Structure formats: C-alpha cells, structure tokens
Amino acid sequence: MSKIRVHEYAKKHNISSKDLMTKLKEMNIEVSNHMTMLDDEVVNKLDNEYQAEKPSVADEFEVEEKVVRSKKNSNKKKKKGKGNEDKRQENFAGRQQTQTVETPDKITFSGSLTVGDLAKKLSKEPSEIIKKLFMLGIMATINQDLDKDTIELIANDYGIEVEEEVIVSETEFETFIDEQDDEENLKERPAVVTIMGHVDHGKTTLLDSIRNSKVTAGEAGGITQHIGAYQVEVNDKKITFLDTPGHAAFTTMRARGAQVTDITILVVAADDGVMPQTVEAINHAKAAGVPIIVAVNKMDKPAANPDRVMQELTEYELVPEAWGGDTIFVPISAIQGEGIDNLLEMILLVSEVEEYKANPNRYATGTVIEAQLDKGKGTIATLLVQNGTLRVGDPIVVGTTFGRVRAMVSDIGRRVKVAGPSTPVEITGLNEVPQAGDRFMAFADEKKARQIGESRAQEALLAQRGEKSKLSLEDLFQQIQEGDVKEINLIVKADVQGSVEAMAASLRKIDVEGVKVKIIHTGVGAITESDIILASASNAIVIGFNVRPDVNAKRTAELENVDIRLHRIIYKVIEEIEAAMQGMLDPEFEEKVIGQAEVRQTFKVTKVGTIAGCYVTDGKITRDSGVRIIRDGVVIYEGQLDTLKRFKDDVKEVAQNYECGITIEKYNDLKEGDIIEAYIMEEVKR
C-alpha cells in the first residue's frame, strides 16, 4: 500500500481533516497539517480505530428511527416556522459542502491578494484566514491587501506552494525579447560582425574585399545593394557583416539598449600602428562586451611592422595568442585580398567557441540597422532579425512605430518571403521612419500591433517631456545611497598625454563607500561628439582638463543629458569627484541682473531712515532681490532691500515704467540720480 495524505484519507472515509487530525493526536501520532503523509502502519491503526467505532445493526436501526422521528417533528415545525427551518437546513448543508472542498496543492497570484481572495484560492473561510493572521500578530479585515510574504506564510501553514506571476506589459516587449528559449528549440545561427578601426586603416576596403570575393562569387547575376548589412558564406556557414559607419553599431544602438554585434574586427594598419580612433574602437568594443579579432592590414606595404602593432595593443589588454594571450591576430592585405580567407575562418572559429544560437520557431525580434524615407516606396528600414523568423505579411512594431511587412529584400537585392535569425533584410510597410537601434517584434494580430505601437509612441512622448536619468555629479550621492551606482564610468580628455595619464591614475585611486571609479576611455584633444555618444551609451561623466567640447559635442551633450566637467587643476577634479560621491558637492551660482530703478526723490523719516522714491527704468525690482547702489557709474554699496512699496502697500515686485518706494537695509545715504540695480543669484546647471 502506498502512502496517503491526511486529507485524502479523510475524504475516503467521509470525515473532516480536522476530526482526523484530532484522532491522530489522541493516538499520539504527530501530524503538522492536512498535507502530512501517512505510512501503512498509521493507516492500518486508523482503519482499526474507525472499524471499532462503527455502530452495530441495532444501533443503526435506532439511529434510523430517530431520524424518521425527527423528520416527522420537522414537518410539524415547518408549518409553524413558514419555511425558516428549510433555509437553516440548506445553509447547514452548504456549510458542510464547503468543508469538503479539496485544498489546492499550489496557488498563483500577482502583486497582492485581499484576505477574501486568499481564502477563496485556499478554499478556506475568510474568518479562518483572519484568525490565522491574528495569531501571527496581524490585524486584518476581509478586504485588506496582503503582501507577498504574508501570503506565503499563510499558504505554507496549509502546506500549499505559492507562485507569483509577474505581468509584463506588451508595450514593453523589450523586457521579454531577450528571454531565454528552451535549449531544445535553439538552433545555430550566423555570427554578426562589425568592422572598426582608425580612419584610412582600410575598414571599407576590407568590407569591399569580403563582399566581392564571397557574395558575388556565390550569387551570379545578383545585384549587390547597400542595405547596411550583408551575408557571406564560408565553408557552408554564413557570417553577417554590419556595413554601418564605424562606431555607430556600438554607440547609438547601445545607447538605445540594443546589442547587435557578436564579434568585432579591429582593423589596424601595419605601417601606422595604434592610433587615437583605434583606442576609441577598443573601448567601444570592451564596453559592449564582445570578442575582438585584430586584422593587421596593409601587410603589402614595405613599412609594415606587425610586431609593433602587437606590442602597442598589449597596452590595451589585447595580447596575441602567439605571446600567450587570447586575442586572435590575422595579418591581411585588404587591397590585394590576402589573408581574407584566414580571417573568415577565424570568425567561424570564434562563432563555434561562443556557440551563437537562436530559436527560429517564434515570432521575429531584432534591431533596426538603418531607416530612411523613399519618395516611391515610403518608409524603408533595414532590420537584423536576431531571434525567430520574419515573414512577409507579419504585423510588426518597430520602436514607437508599427505596420505590416509588405515586402522583404535580401542583401543581394532579391525578394524573399522569410528571414531567419542573424539575417539582414530591407522591409517596407511601416507608417513612420524608426531610428537605428530601435528594437522590433512581430505579432500575430495587426490590431494588437497597432495598439502597442500607438501606446509606445504615447509613452515615448511623455518620457521625452520628463527628465532623462543620466548620471551626473549632482545626483551621484543620492544614486549611491539608493544602491543604483556601484561603479562610476568616466571619460577623460586632456591637452597632453602626460596629463591624461596623471589624471586617470589619480581618479582610479578614489574609493568612497565601496563605489569605485572606472575610466572607460581616455584621449588627447578636444571633447568630441564621439566621446559624448560613448558617455551616453555607457552612462558616463566626461572630464575635460585644459580642453573644451566642440560645437557638435556641446549640442549632443545637451540632447543626451551628458554631464561634462571642465577643469584646469588636477586636484580640483579629484576633490570634485570625491565631494560628489560623499554628497558634499557645493552648488555653483551666477549673478543675474533683473532690473534697474532710478532714485527720483528722497524722504527722511524718523525711525525708518531714508526712503527713496524710485522709477523702474528696466526689468523689474523684486522684494527678495539683492541690490547695489551705483553713483556716477561706481558701485558705492551692495546689500538687501528692506522694504518695497507702491503707494502705502507692500508689494513683491514692481515692473518697468512704474514708481515705487524703496528702503535699503542698513543704508541711508541715498541721493537723487542714484541707480539701484537689482539682481538674483541663480544656480548654474552644471
């Protein structure tokens, strides 16, 4: 005989779980609740107990007789009580029925539950739950909300498992785009590769060389068109290349929360070595957390020195495999097509190690690579499908816009009906132009896609009106206190390399309350737009030492709400960062002149002093403003207003072309012709 639970035994023998638990207690058998398992020995003992308690035939006859008599009596009472007894019996029967309802093994809830709702889910009376809460020291009514911990406490007391449902709004589909699929549904997908490097080191030549050698060779008659991405086939395996301007794939897309790249090819010219933009590219790739393969280009040139390139890159933690590191270095000549096959094989090798997989059997999700408005076709968007399969006719939501996929064109200009994971396609059918880096998701229902698209557009509009929560020194302390910041990302730019190194070394030593400083990029020269975009994507603060931001950088910083700090003394930078981390950053104020008044007449009043009868010539004079007295162009006194009146009434301000009476705090030497200049101190937005 297998084990049986207390409530199952009770149900089998038509007795309540409570009575059975009482019986077990009398038999000195310990049970914690109705879910306790009873072994064969206990079951046999119970069977014997209840067998012994069964009434004899004579007893049964007596009981039956009593029941018959009671029925007769009840019939008499029915006539007297006008059906009241019937109702009582019905209620009693109803109560008995609720007692026999089986308790569930598991309940689910979302957010919170009222006492009444919890009782219903547990198949219990609300009064019983209230009693249990009272025993736990919680005074509750039937409509009172219970939190997660209390729900779990009560349910566990009954031996019932609790599961909280987290409801995610469909408008925020980014939150479940990256949800892990079951391993059995995952299939191998092509790697997505971005090529980065310094200007004139051969990025475009390398892309052209790969495209010409692989795409056109395999697609005779196919017209290769520029859609921002393309695929090549190597050893029966595909690789997707993003043909986007330099660092855009990492910056604007990462700033918008999109991770599109799997592998970065860092192109370094063998005759030039590591240059400023090379370092920038390394920092972008590291911030995105993707593997780097170094392509040492221009090996055909006489001045080519690959060993120098390797040596320089070790300073940035890119150590070649030949030197005991884990970075793959491939010597190539993009212009002559040498080493290209080896580079592609290395990409396949990294793909194999990293095991890039996706689930093709679901609705497509992915990222916008490029988008534009065409006079003939309308909105055209290049999408990179990252998971699932996109089909012609699918309703789709892209960023804050929506539509239906009317047509899909591959990277070789052919119309296609389906696009699987890691496939770039150009689509038409969207109602507005999305932005590069926007996420997309296909839906089953066009009506739902429209609703979600419109909701997202509305939410984006509201969010735009609100403040962006980028990291700044003003709110740094608060964010540290709230536990939002564990590491402060900084970008350091200075006039000379020595200053950069000195400042970076000093900043790295700062450690306040376990929050450390991380330098994500350093450079010599003016603060550029690229620095601001990296800061925005990495939520960093930009520090400038003896350098200024250029016009584009200033504009982008304002748009992206990136905090720029400019200094001329190193220890001031350190002091400011430490003060901000400790919550002691003093606000900066600047003076703003708000108005001027001319003294037309003066009056001496006992116990009051000199009252100046004035005429406001410019702006306004306010009661709480600071003032300075100017006589013949020279400031002779600076202080505060004591009173500001119009006729006999105290006023808060007097506007231009109106007369007023003014007294100055602790100053009476006012003369006709004096100018009273009013100013306020405004906090400078850093």
Curated annotation (Swiss-Prot):
MF annotations from Gene Ontology: GTP binding; GTPase activity; translation initiation factor activity
UniProt-annotated binding residues for GTP: 197-204, 243-247, 297-300
Region (G5): 333-335
InterPro entries referenced in this protein's UniProt entry, alphabetically: EF-G-like_DII (IPR053905), IF2_II (IPR044145), IF2_N (IPR006847), P-loop_NTPase (IPR027417), Small_GTP-bd (IPR005225), T_Tr_GTP-bd_dom (IPR000795), TF_IF2_bacterial-like (IPR000178), TIF_IF2 (IPR015760)
Pfam families: EF-G_D2, GTP_EFTU, IF-2, IF2_N
GO CC term (a single one): cytosol
Subcellular location: Cytoplasm
SUPFAM superfamilies: Initiation factor IF2/eIF5b, domain 3, P-loop containing nucleoside triphosphate hydrolases, Translation proteins
Region entry G4, spans: 297-300
Basic residues bias: start-end ranges: 69-81
UniProt superkingdom: Bacteria
Region feature (G2): 222-226
UniProt-annotated stretches for the region G1: 197-204
Domain tr-type G as annotated: residue spans: 188-357
Region (Disordered): 54-105
UniProt keywords, alphabetically: Cytoplasm, GTP-binding, Initiation factor, Nucleotide-binding, Protein biosynthesis
Residue ranges of the region described as G3: 243-246
HAMAP family xrefs: IF_2_B
The family this protein is said to belong to: Belongs to the TRAFAC class translation factor GTPase superfamily. Classic translation factor GTPase family. IF-2 subfamily.
Function: One of the essential components for the initiation of protein synthesis. Protects formylmethionyl-tRNA from spontaneous hydrolysis and promotes its binding to the 30S ribosomal subunits. Also involved in the hydrolysis of GTP during the formation of the 70S ribosomal complex.
Protein name as catalogued: Translation initiation factor IF-2
Organism: Bacillus cereus (strain AH187)
Gene behind the chain: infB
